[in-house]
Amino acid sequence: MPSKFSLSLVAKKNTRDTDGSDPRKPKVPRVHDLTATPELCPVEPPPEVVAKLGEQNLAVGIDIETADWTEKKHALHKGQFGFHTMCGPEVFDQRIIQIGWFVKDLSNPDADNEHDELIIQPDGFEIAVKATKLHGVSNERAQQDGMPLKTALDIFMRVMERLEQRSARLVIHHLEFDAGIIDRELTTAGLDHYRQRWQSMARAGFCTMDPTIGKWIQRCCGRTFDVHENSTAVMSLERTINLLSPSLPVCEAVQNFRRNRLHTAGSDAQLHCLIYKTLREMATNGLDLAAQSKLARP
């Protein structure tokens, strides 16, 4: 791939340090620090980034919302699908109450984007208050507007089978979490015959929390970016959006995020596709993030 150039942000040398750090070394600013000055430098994606981004033109963003979540974190490791995670086995006992998908044809901006979002009725479990505050689905709403788990996952997997035939690629923020819970829920719903196909699609998917991608974003933007340093994947998604927001198109999902910070499955699935599209453009077109609004927070 030919070299591309973009403006990245490099911090000015600090000559008045009082914290004991070496003032001769430039500091890399945090995401919220907008005091850096632009400097032209080459940012060519390394081969491992190019390989991870892939060449598929059809992406399907996937997201789930759960009835609760655990705050426990483990050492960073690779999960069952080969992606990095800090989740332990207890995470995969979480119950899905909303699942959404958004299909994006990267080669045709005028193509209709197939999308849907399904609410699942709780069966023997309650939705935690903290979860409702995150995604807006209460126990009452889920019982009224939801459908049985088996019905929802059967609809979902039929769509996935059709998209797989079109060589669509899964794009998920924290793939091990979402894909692992979906895999477990397929068994819970008595739909084990879908698991092999789902696992195959997940292994070939793209995780927007990949540390290699995070390091490359840091090079492009001149800002520290550790996707796994946040307490939850939701915070990591918000940080990713903050970094890429000047480049993300104005759409309902982005407006919803900026307006009320609700993380519904359908909106987050669309955001996953937009992040993937932006990263692909950064790699192929040398998209200049730093020149656009100085990475202003949304």
Regions flagged by a language model, labelled:
Residues 45-48, 154-158:
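A generic local structural motif
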Residues 134-156:
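Metal-dependent phosphoesterase signature
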